[in-house]
Regions:
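C-terminal "cap" of GNAT-fold acetyltransferases
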Residues: 127-145, 151, 248-254, 266, ...
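A short beta-loop-alpha structural element at the N-terminal edge
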Residues: 1-14, 145-158, 268
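Active-site rim helix/loop that mediates acceptor-substrate recognition in acyltransferases
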Residues: 18-47, 56, 165-197, 201
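Conserved active-site alpha-helix within GNAT-family acetyltransferase domains
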Residues: 106-124, 223, 227, 251-269
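Conserved donor-binding loop and adjoining core beta-sheet/short helix segment
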Residues: 19, 29-87, 91-93, 200-212, ...
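Acyl-donor-binding surface of acyltransferase catalytic domains
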Residues: 73-143, 273-276
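Conserved acetyl-CoA-binding loop-helix of GNAT-fold acetyltransferases
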Residues: 78-91, 216, 222-235, 239, ...
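Conserved hydrophobic beta-strand within the GNAT/NAT acetyltransferase core sheet
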Residues: 100-105, 211, 245-249
């Protein structure tokens, strides 16, 4: 058994592992899992020229390294694979000689157990809300801003808005926002005479939509911009004939929960623990 860094040439074997195996953890992300090939740390266990397990958690942005994937072949123990690959990842990070947070959202029980055994600490929970699409006529107006469609040229500024609007570990890199924009069904910005002050990116599948990202510059918060972006999205969902709109937020983000409650979103009862591991050189 060999534990080593993944190489671009591993793509076919990794694709098979992700497709055929059931013990697979995927981070909630816009970027395809195999796009992380070539980034570090991304470790694999290889035996007899076959990849038995993989663990990837490159830093992006630099302050946070989300666990992007953990996949295990049915022929080996998830606990053993995790132990070997997590040791490999820790060694990779220790060589960088800088502090970093490693984050993971526990989407299933078996993965949550592995995190807790490795001294990850629960910091928060992600909760899910839903709005059942109804015919509505929102008054969408702002005395100092307008809402328009997001363009590719907006992405650098949108990334700056995101970085200022969210604390670590919730910030997104420009590359992640670009990937989100490419997959978006509906993406808009709120623009004042000072420039872009807020944005939203949403995806759609079949008859459902998901508000994947909503951000407003701190100096412009509590001025109706976030509500206007969501209202415009609700109108668009109705126009498209969609049946539901979901959104995730943190359990302790009271301002966000209050906003969605005012706009007739309701908690679904789904909750996913957020775990962090502090790497201090």
């Amino acid at each position: 058994m060999i534990v080593r860094s993944a190489h671009p040439s591993d793509r076919p074997n990794l694709a098979s592992l992700l497709y055929y195996e059931q013990t697979v953890y995927r981070h909630l992300d816009w970027r395809p899992l195999l796009d992380w090939l070539g980034k570090s740390p991304f470790g694999v266990i290889e035996e007899n020229d076959a990849i038995q397990a993989a663990l990837a958690c490159p830093s992006d942005p630099p302050e946070i390294a989300w666990i992007r994937l953990f996949a295990v072949d049915s022929g080996i123990s998830p606990q053993m694979a995790w132990k070997e690959l997590w040791r490999f990842v820790l060694d990779q990070f220790s060589q960088e000689q800088r502090p970093v947070q490693v984050g993971a959202i526990a989407l299933n029980g078996w993965f949550q157990g592995l995190l807790e055994e490795s001294d990850f600490k629960q910091q928060n929970e992600v909760v899910v809300l839903i709005w059942k699409v109804a015919h509505i006529r929102h008054e969408i107006s702002g005395s100092f801003f307008k809402i328009r469609r997001m363009t590719e040229k907006d992405l650098p500024v949108v990334a700056q808005v995101d970085h200022l609007a969210f604390p670590s570990p919730w910030q997104l890199s420009e590359n992640s926002i670009k990937a989100g924009h490419e997959q978006a069904a509906m993406a808009t910005v709120a623009e004042s005479e000072d420039g872009i002050v807020g944005y939203q990116i949403s995806t759609a599948l079949n008859d459902s939509a998901h508000l994947a990202r909503l951000a407003v510059l701190p100096a412009y918060q509590n001025r109706g911009i976030g509500a206007a972006l969501v209202k415009a999205l609700q109108v668009d969902c109705d126009r498209r004939g969609l049946r539901s709109l979901t959104v995730n937020t943190q359990a302790d983000n009271l301002a966000s929960l209050h906003l969605y409650s005012k706009l007739n979103f309701h908690l679904t009862g789904e909750r996913y623990p957020l775990y962090l591991f502090e790497m201090i050189p």
